[in-house]
Amino acid sequence: MATLSLTVNSGDPPLGALLAVEHVKDDVSISVEEGKENILHVSENVIFTDVNSILRYLARVATTAGLYGSNLMEHTEIDHWLEFSATKLSSCDSFTSTINELNHCLSLRTYLVGNSLSLADLCVWATLKGNAAWQEQLKQKKAPVHVKRWFGFLEAQQAFQSVGTKWDVSTTKARVAPEKKQDVGKFVELPGAEMGKVTVRFPPEASGYLHIGHAKAALLNQHYQVNFKGKLIMRFDDTNPEKEKEDFEKVILEDVAMLHIKPDQFTYTSDHFETIMKYAEKLIQEGKAYVDDTPAEQMKAEREQRIDSKHRKNPIEKNLQMWEEMKKGSQFGQSCCLRAKIDMSSNNGCMRDPTLYRCKIQPHPRTGNKYNVYPTYDFACPIVDSIEGVTHALRTTEYHDRDEQFYWIIEALGIRKPYIWEYSRLNLNNTVLSKRKLTWFVNEGLVDGWDDPRFPTVRGVLRRGMTVEGLKQFIAAQGSSRSVVNMEWDKIWAFNKKVIDPVAPRYVALLKKEVIPVNVPEAQEEMKEVAKHPKNPEVGLKPVWYSPKVFIEGADAETFSEGEMVTFINWGNLNITKIHKNADGKIISLDAKLNLENKDYKKTTKVTWLAETTHALPIPVICVTYEHLITKPVLGKDEDFKQYVNKNSKHEELMLGDPCLKDLKKGDIIQLQRRGFFICDQPYEPVSPYSCKEAPCVLIYIPDGHTKEMPTSGSKEKTKVEATKNETSAPFKERPTPSLNNNCTTSEDSLVLYNRVAVQGDVVRELKAKKAPKEDVDAAVKQLLSLKAEYKEKTGQEYKPGNPPAEIGQNISSNSSASILESKSLYDEVAAQGEVVRKLKAEKSPKAKINEAVECLLSLKAQYKEKTGKEYIPGQPPLSQSSDSSPTRNSEPAGLETPEAKVLFDKVASQGEVVRKLKTEKAPKDQVDIAVQELLQLKAQYKSLIGVEYKPVSATGAEDKDKKKKEKENKSEKQNKPQKQNDGQRKDPSKNQGGGLSSSGAGEGQGPKKQTRLGLEAKKEENLADWYSQVITKSEMIEYHDISGCYILRPWAYAIWEAIKDFFDAEIKKLGVENCYFPMFVSQSALEKEKTHVADFAPEVAWVTRSGKTELAEPIAIRPTSETVMYPAYAKWVQSHRDLPIKLNQWCNVVRWEFKHPQPFLRTREFLWQEGHSAFATMEEAAEEVLQILDLYAQVYEELLAIPVVKGRKTEKEKFAGGDYTTTIEAFISASGRAIQGGTSHHLGQNFSKMFEIVFEDPKIPGEKQFAYQNSWGLTTRTIGVMTMVHGDNMGLVLPPRVACVQVVIIPCGITNALSEEDKEALIAKCNDYRRRLLSVNIRVRADLRDNYSPGWKFNHWELKGVPIRLEVGPRDMKSCQFVAVRRDTGEKLTVAENEAETKLQAILEDIQVTLFTRASEDLKTHMVVANTMEDFQKILDSGKIVQIPFCGEIDCEDWIKKTTARDQDLEPGAPSMGAKSLCIPFKPLCELQPGAKCVCGKNPAKYYTLFGRSY
C-alpha cells in the first residue's frame, strides 16, 4: 500500500487523528507534515478532511490494531461515540449534562467500548483535551470521578504522551461563531433598579394558550431578571373563576418552559385572597369605597356621562351591610359590586369609580366555594405586586390609563409602591391575538387546534418551524420600546432563518405529477456520500444514489435545449443529447451523456434530481404551505375580523422525496433544495400490515422572510453570467492597437498571448472572490501559469500586468519616438522635482530651501507646457498619436529594451515592493532606511544606464479589473454611504479615461503625491447602485442623515426642485388652483375614516406617541398624504354648489416609513412634493382636470428634465387605494431595465366626499343632497433621481439646461507663475465680464476663480456636477478675442468668437436640451416593445426592456404574472429578483388590440394592451 500523507494545521491540530496515527504506524506507512489544513491524502483523487472520517479510514486499513471494535455491535457503539464527541461534547450549552452522562457510562468500564482501546476513546479523549470547561474542572478538582480516572489512565500511556509532547493543543471553548453585533432592540434601564434587588413578574391568566404577545412580556421580564441578577415571579392571575381552567395552567407552564424561561417563584393571586379582602373592607370603613347595585349597562352609561351613582353617598354602615350580602352570595348580593370612590368627573375613564370586587357564586379551581366575592385584576394586581416584593411592574402601553388607578389604590391602602414600566404591545399583521377571537377559529373548525401552524400561539409558530432561539431573537430585537407598530410576519421569519439556515440539512423533493425521466446509459448504479450542508460539514453526510435513469421536474426540462450542458447538483455536468416530446409537444423524456470531467458550473442551469434504483426508492412526501389567517393586514377598531377570514389558507402538494427523508423525526428542520425550509410534522411510516399502505412524510413550509415567492424550477443563470464574462474579457479583446509594419506578426501573436494571460488572470480573481471550490481555483491557476510560461518562452520576458509586449512600440516611426522621448524626459524631470519639494516639506526644511525648490519646479512646468502645449498633470505622461489609441502600451525610450535595462528595471521594481512591504508591516526604522537606500542606489544606476529617471509602469486595463469586488447591493443603507473625500488634484478623465488615478505602481518607493478620488469609482453599466450613490454625493446633491431613509437636499439638488416648482406653480395657477398649507399631523380617527385608503398606507404611517417624557393620550400620525387632513375642512366650506369648485395645492413634505432598502430621491421615508386636491360639482369637470394635470406632469419631464414618458391609466391592482381611477406618467431607466412612476393624477370619484360628508344641494333637484366629485394629484422629488439615472454617465451628473442651477461655468486657464500680474488680472476681469454679459441675457452662470485648484481639477469638478457648458478662457484666447465652450453632454469643444458669446451659448444650451431628450427618446423607443405571448414577454423582460402585452385586467392574473416573472437571486445570481408589474394602460399603445385577442395568461379575453415591466 502507498504511503499516506496527513497534513496538520499546527494552529488547530486534529488530536484524534494524530492519536490514531500513533496506534497504526506499525501497520500503515503514513507521513505527518505541517500545513494550512487538516487533510489525509490517500491518493490523487481521494482525500479526507473530516477528523472522524480520517479516524474511520485509518482504523479500517489497520485492522490488526483493532481500533474499530471486533464485531458489529462494537462498531455501532464506536460510531455513536464519534458522533457524541463531535456534537454534544463540543457544545458549551450542554457540557455539564454531557460530562455527567459520560461519567455514568464509564462507572464500570476501563474503556468506552469493549475491553481494549478504540476510536471511541481516542476521539472523546481528544475532544476533552482541547475543552476549556473540562480543563477548568480538572484545575478546580471538580471533575466527575470516573471520567477523571479514565482520562488520567489514557494520558499516562506512551502514545498519548508522545502526541501531547509534539503538538501544542490550546484549550478552547466549544466552537463559537464569529462575534458580530446582534440585531437586538434597545432595553431601557429600569429607573431606581439596583443590582440583585430587582423583582419582576409575569402574570398570565390561565384561560388560554400563550401567544407571541405573551412571549414578549415573559422575555422582557426575563431580560431584566438576568441583567440585574434579580428575581422573576410567575404568577397566575386567577381572579375570575369563570375563566380560570386548571388545564390551561399546565399548558402555560409548558409554553414558558419552551421559551427557556426559569422563574424563581410560582404564585397565584388566590394565595392572597384573604389579604385582598381585608384591604377592600379597609377602603369601605375609610369611606373610600362603596357597594353599588346599579345594573351594568346603566353603570356604564353613568360613567360615560360622569353621573354619580345613587349609592355613592351611602353611609359606611349601609355599605358594610351590602358587602356582607355580597360575601354570602345572596340574590341581592349577586346584583352588587364594590366600587372605589375616586373621581366621577375625571377625564380618565379608569378613575371614574372603577369596580374593585364582584360577586360570583361559581366554585374557584383552587379555593372551591370558600369565597363568593372575587377582586378585579386591577384591584388585586397592585396589592399582590406590593406584597410579593415586585420592584418593577412591566405592563404594555394599553394599560397606560389604568396606571393612575394602580397608584391610587397603593396610596389609599398605604402599602409599598412598585414602579410601573411600560412597553409596546406586539401587534402582528394578518392575524388576531385576542383569545376570544382565536377560540372562535378553534370552535368553528377553521384550524386544527391551538397549535395550528397558522396561529400566533407559541405552539403554533413552533409547529410551523419557528425555533425558540429565533423567537427569542425576534422579541429581543423589539426591546422595551414604547413605539406602537404593526409588525409584518416577514420580520419574525427572517430572524428564524438566521438560526436554521446554518444547520438545516439539504434534501431533494420533486413535484410528483411533473417528473420527467432522464436516461443516462453510461451511468453506473452506485452510491456516494455527500455533505448534507454545503457550508457546514458538521451537519454530516447523506447517501446519494446514481443510476442510468434519473428523474427531474418538468419545469426544469422545459428550459433545456439539445446539446446544452446542465449541472445536476451533487453529481456534475451532463450534456442533453436528445429531448423526446409527445404529439402535444410536451416533453416525456430526455437523453443525456455524462460530462463529469468538465468542472465549469458557472454558465450552466442547476437542477435537482432523484435516481431510480431499487436500493433506495423515493418516498411519498406531502408539502403543506400555510397562508395568513386574515386577508387584511391591519383591522380597524370596529371591523369584524370574520369578514376577512382566509378560507383557503392551506395548500398541499404531493412530492417524490429523497430516500433520506424516511429517517426524519417529528420536529426536524430541513431545506428542500430550491424550495425552501420545511419542518417534519409527520414522519414517514413504511407499509402498515393493517392498511397495506405507507404513510407519507408530511412537511410544513417554513417562511424565511422573503416578501416574494421563491421560484422552484425552470430557472436559468446563463445570461447574466455570460454577460459578466464578456465584460471581464472585453478590455483585452477590444483594445485598439496602433497600425504597424507588415512584418510584425510575431508581435501580434505576443499581444494575443498577453491578452489571454490577462483574461485568465481575471478568471482566477473572480473564482477566488466568489470563494469557488479549491479544485476549480487550482485548475484555473494551473492554466494561468501555463499561459505565463508560454508568454515568457515567446517574448523572452516575464508577463507583467499593464506592460504588453514591447516589440510593438519599436515599430513606431523614429520622428514620433524622438519627440515623445524628449517630452517624456521633461515630464520625468518635473515629477522628480515634485518629489524633491514634497520631501523637503515632509522633513520640515528651512523655508528658503523649499522656495528655491518650488521655483525650480514651476520653471520646469513652464518648459513642459511650452514643449507640449499642455499643463503638467501627474499620472499623465505625454503620449504619441498612436499611443493615444492604446493606453496600455509603453512609451519608454528604446534603451529600456536592452537586456541589462530590463534586469535593472526588474530589480528596482522588486526593491520597491520590499520597501512597501516593510512599511506595511511597520518594520523597525533602521531596517526600512537600509531598504530605501538600496532602492535609491538602484534608481541612480538605472538613470545612468538609460538616461532617464526610473518610472514605474502605470497599469491600466487588467489591473483596473483587480479593484475591490462590488459589495452586495442589498446591504444596509448606512454601509452604502460614501466617505467624504478631500479635494485635491486629479487628472481630467475626459482626456484619459480608464487610466489609474496616480502614476505610482510596482517598484515606486515614494511615488507622486496621492491623487484625491474626485471622480466616480463605479461605472454605471457595471454597478448601478454604487454609481448612483457616488453621483448624488460627489455632485453635492445629497448629504446622508443619521436617520435611515432621510436625506439632506443640498442647494444643487434643491435648485432643480425649485425649477420644477416655478414652472408647475405658474401653470396650475392658470387653471385656477390656489396654494395653501394644512397641518402635518393627523388624528387616528381621521386617518381610519377611509378604510381602503388607510389599509394601503398603514404599514408606512409614522406615529408620534410622546411629548417630552409624557405619553400622549392618543397617538398622532404624521401625514403619509393629506386627504384625511384636508377633507374635513372641505366638508365645512362646501354648503352649496356655488362653493365649488375648490382647487387647492400645497408644497410640503410627507413621511412614509418604507421598510424596503431606501434610495435617495427614489425611495425615501421623507420627501418633498406638491399635492393638489380639488372638488367639483360634476364628474365631467373632475375628469377634465385629471388629464390637464397629467399633461403638465408630462411637460415637467419632457420639457424641463428632457425625459420621455408614457401616459396612461393604472390597472385596478395598481390604482390609488380609495380612488375610482388613476392616471400616470411612466419613465424608463435603461441602465437597470426598470421603469419608474413619474407622477400620478387620481380621480377619487365620490368615495372620499361620502366618507367626509362633502355635500351640497343639487341645483337641479332642490332639497336633494349631492356628493362632490374629487381629484388628487402629486409630483415628488423622485423626479431628481429619475433625471440622474436617465442622463448621468461615468463622469457624473448631466443636467438638462432648463433645470440646471448653473448653466455655464467660466474657468480661467493658463494662470502660471510665468504669467505677469497684469495679464492675470486682465484674465480674471475678462471672466467677470463674460459672467456679467451672460447674466444680462438670463443665463445662469458662475465663474470659478478659486486659485487653490488647477484648471484640470475644476474641469473634473464641474463635469461631475453636470454643468451643461464649460467656458474656458486663457491669455491666448483673450488675444484672439475668442473662448472655448465645452459641452457636458457630448464632450464636444467649440471655439466661439467673443462678440457672439450670448447668442451662441443660448443656442448651444437649447441644442443640449434637445439632444438629451432625443437620446432618451431613442432609448425608450428601443426598450419598449410589444409581446403577444407569455414566452416572448419573459424573454424580452429578461433582456431589460418594458413590454406592452394583451391583458385582461384581472388582479389575480396580474399577481400570477408578477409571480411567474420573479427570479430568485439564490438560484440566479445577478438576476433581477422582482417580478414584472403593470405600469399603465397606455393612452397610445404601440399597436391596436385585435378582435378575439387573448390575455397572455391564456384564460381570459384581452381588454387592452398594458405596459408591464420591472419597476422601482
Swiss-Prot record:
Which EC number(s) does the record attach to this protein? 6.1.1.17, 6.1.1.15
Q: Region (3 X 57 AA approximate repeats): which ranges? A: 760-956
Q: Which residues hold Zn(2+)?
A: 1448, 1453, 1495, 1497
Segments of skewed composition (Low complexity): 878-887
Resulting phenotype, residue 1115 to R: In HLD15; slightly decreased protein level; does not affect multisynthetase complex assembly
Describe the family membership recorded for this protein in Swiss-Prot or TrEMBL.
In the N-terminal section; belongs to the class-I aminoacyl-tRNA synthetase family. Glutamate--tRNA ligase type 2 subfamily. In the C-terminal section; belongs to the class-II aminoacyl-tRNA synthetase family.
UniProt disease link = Leukodystrophy, hypomyelinating, 15: An autosomal recessive disorder characterized by hypomyelinating leukodystrophy with thinning of the corpus callosum. Clinical features include motor and cognitive impairment appearing in the first or second decade of life, dystonia, ataxia, spasticity, and dysphagia. Most patients develop severe optic atrophy, and some have hearing loss.
> What is the protein named?
Bifunctional glutamate/proline--tRNA ligase
Q: Which organism is it from?
A: Homo sapiens
